Amino acid sequence: MASLKSIKKRIVSVKNTGQITKAMKMVSAAKLRRAQENVVAARPYAAKLGEVLGRLSRNQDADSSPLMIKRTTGKALLIVVTSDRGLCGGFNANLCKAAERFVKERGAEFTDLSIMTIGRKGYEFLKNRQKIRKNFGTVFSNLNYQTAALLAQEVIQGYLDEEFDEVFIIYNAFRSVMSQDITLEQLLPVTPPEAADEEYAPEYIYEPSKSELLGELLPKHIEVQIFKSLLESVASEHGARMTAMDSASKNANEMIGKLTLQYNRARQAAITTELMEIISGAESIKG
């Protein structure tokens, strides 16, 4: 049986760990509220921009913009969005495994498939397993629209320079604190959502022309999609960490209970042993 001293030391250690996990849960809860607000604000904007692109692209040729042209040379880029920090359950590992499944299942469709990682954890997981084109490991330390725009511009330029012909992004979409959905989307070539057929749809007069507006809005669309994906990932990360730390705190409390019971039993056994020794000593003196 473990000594009283070692059991007490373990109880103190687990209590300290429990305090840390509880504090991390509270920090993640506060950050989650802000991140969730950002996601809720970004989704309608992204949806409306897609709706506008759908109207603009109606009756337009597929080659009306370089970003809509489909090429068949077979070079592709997969953007993998993870976090910079761990302690968030299977948040990063599950997404990286999904990225590897994509490479395995669809890799044969492309002559070259490279990966761009956003987030340190994704890079660390994939760097020795897949072809990494580039890693952005400090994006989340100061995430803003300008950062996403710079990422988008690099991706767009690579597409225009025909370094790759298709661009996909995989990330964790936020659903709730307990639920994050791994989501795969195609960024390039842009395929605007089809505008809904309306019996009495208004006829818009565009100034400047539709093609000019598409030329301006398509890069903006890529920027918004990447920014929204990053915001979704941040909210999902905090939700996953909050859940993981809550589970860790409960496990710590449960372990403290078991160790306390073990400590009390060991202490009781030690006291009983001492009493038996005293009684035996007294009996031997009498004898």
Swiss-Prot record:
UniProt name for this protein: ATP synthase gamma chain
The keyword Cell membrane is annotated on this UniProt entry: yes
Membrane topology: Peripheral membrane protein
UniProtKB keywords: ATP synthesis, Cell inner membrane, Cell membrane, CF(1), Hydrogen ion transport, Ion transport, Membrane, Transport
Organism of derivation: Geotalea daltonii (strain DSM 22248 / JCM 15807 / FRC-32) (Geobacter daltonii)
Pfam families according to UniProt: ATP-synt (PF00231)
One of the GO biological process terms: proton motive force-driven plasma membrane ATP synthesis
Subunit structure and binding partners: F-type ATPases have 2 components, CF(1) - the catalytic core - and CF(0) - the membrane proton channel. CF(1) has five subunits: alpha(3), beta(3), gamma(1), delta(1), epsilon(1). CF(0) has three main subunits: a, b and c.
Subcellular location: Cell inner membrane
Cellular component GO terms held in the UniProt record: plasma membrane; proton-transporting ATP synthase complex
Gene3D superfamilies listed in its UniProt record: 3.40.1380.10, ATP synthase, gamma subunit, helix hairpin domain (1.10.287.80)
Record's keyword annotation contains Ion transport: yes
GO molecular function: ATP binding; proton-transporting ATP synthase activity, rotational mechanism
Family of this protein: Belongs to the ATPase gamma chain family.
Role according to the record: Produces ATP from ADP in the presence of a proton gradient across the membrane. The gamma chain is believed to be important in regulating ATPase activity and the flow of protons through the CF(0) complex.
